[in-house]
């Protein structure tokens, strides 16, 4: 599947203007990136119809370092959030296996969000989602990190809610600190208490069923091979793919 010229027009203004005699258009590069994301192939394995693989890889790397893909995600996200009229958001995480090619980042790049758990090397994606197609914000952590602290960082990055919004979370986030932060920010936490709670609380079980929306979004993202497994040594490149895949999936829903 490819991004059509009509869909590309929605994100074209986010990309650097091409000048001079350019062999590969930005649309060609974007579709090559989508091919790699969907099939999980090595950059060298790109079909010849996309052009020189190294040019494509270099351009994506440049866009990632310059924050172009983040800007693209934020622009499209604004359109999606206006369309869905947020009343409920869900906070959750999912574990990503790290391929051997994704380990061993040079130390000069600093620590990466890769950690070891019982299943081997893993990365965790933490996400706040408005529905099964719309991510609000996301981040990475090493696989062994606990969900609650990362969830609180995401909530703090959102800032105060403009109006009361239900925040659906599973038991990993039922701690007092997380629930209090949600209340302080203007959210209405909907989270079941752990069974060992001395004073358990009631929660909206019907509303809680909508938490499956963030799980469905994770399932959509994992349909892309480059998201399902982490091949990137650097967080920046993996986050770049994640932003780009959310954009590509969002374009299909909008156009």
Regions of interest found by a model, annotated:
Residues 1-255:
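Short alpha-helical elements
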């Amino acid at each position: 599947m490819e991004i059509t010229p009509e869909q590309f027009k929605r994100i074209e203004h986010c990309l650097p203007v091409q000048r001079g005699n350019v062999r590969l258009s930005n649309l060609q590069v974007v579709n090559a990136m989508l091919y790699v994301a969907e099939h999980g192939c090595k950059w060298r394995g790109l079909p010849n119809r996309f052009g020189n693989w190294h040019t494509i890889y270099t351009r994506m790397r440049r866009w990632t370092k310059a924050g172009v893909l983040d800007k693209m995600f934020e622009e499209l996200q604004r359109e999606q959030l206006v369309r869905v009229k947020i009343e409920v958001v869900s906070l959750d995480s999912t574990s990503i296996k790290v391929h051997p090619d994704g380990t061993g980042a040079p130390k000069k790049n600093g620590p990466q969000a890769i950690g070891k758990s019982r299943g081997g090397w893993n990365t965790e994606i933490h996400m706040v989602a408005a529905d099964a197609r719309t991510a609000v914000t996301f981040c990475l952590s090493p696989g062994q990190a606990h969900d609650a602290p990362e969830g609180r960082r995401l909530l703090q990055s959102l800032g105060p809610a403009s109006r009361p919004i239900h925040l659906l979370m599973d038991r990993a986030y039922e701690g007092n600190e997380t629930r209090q932060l949600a209340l302080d920010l203007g959210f209405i936490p909907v989270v079941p208490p752990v069974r060992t709670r001395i004073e358990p609380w009631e929660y909206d079980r019907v509303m809680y069923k909508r938490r499956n929306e963030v799980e469905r979004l994770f399932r959509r993202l994992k349909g892309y091979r480059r998201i399902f497994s982490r091949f990137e040594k650097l967080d920046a490149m993996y986050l770049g793919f994640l932003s780009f895949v959310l954009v590509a999936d969002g374009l299909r829903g909008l156009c």
